[in-house]
């Protein structure tokens, strides 16, 4: 059980770990996506990577904004996937499966992030 002294629960540590994972995936997307965009490829990876980096940072700060940024990036991913390949399930799978699984995990962290935010507010932090 969390307290006002700042001790973290297991769910908070797991949420922070997920924030690190999202941040690292975002950095990979930004760096690899920039190379791809310079070669004339899709700018999706750069834009999505920026959203994921911001999401990971906010999750590490214990802010629900991080989860909602990720869910926005996931919606963007689905729109881009349909635009790229249409409604072909076999072609959608590699583009949307991994981000959707990660999105489910991120959505499950929203109550934990809210608790972290409220505790920080009680301590007087902004």
Curated annotation (Swiss-Prot):
Q: What is its EC number?
A: 1.1.99.22
Q: What is its main location?
A: membrane
Entry superkingdom = Bacteria
Keywords assigned by UniProt? Cell membrane, Membrane, Oxidoreductase, Transmembrane, Transmembrane helix
Q: What is this protein called?
A: Glycerol dehydrogenase small subunit
- Which enzyme type, at the first EC level? oxidoreductase
Q: Which organism is it from?
A: Gluconobacter thailandicus
Answer whether the UniProt record assigns the keyword RNA-binding to this protein.
no
């Amino acid at each position: 059980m969390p307290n006002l002294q700042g001790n973290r629960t297991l769910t908070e540590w797991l949420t922070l770990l997920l924030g690190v994972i999202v941040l690292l995936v975002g950095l990979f997307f930004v760096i690899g996506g920039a190379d791809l965009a310079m070669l004339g490829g899709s700018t999706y990876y750069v834009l999505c990577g920026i959203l994921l980096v911001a999401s990971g940072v906010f999750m590490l700060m214990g802010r629900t904004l991080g989860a909602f940024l990720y869910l926005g990036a996931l919606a963007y991913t689905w729109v881009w996937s349909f635009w790229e390949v249409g409604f072909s399930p076999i072609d959608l799978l590699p583009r949307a499966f991994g981000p959707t699984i990660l999105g489910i995990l991120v959505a499950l962290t929203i109550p934990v992030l809210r608790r972290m935010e409220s505790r920080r507010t009680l301590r007087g932090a902004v």
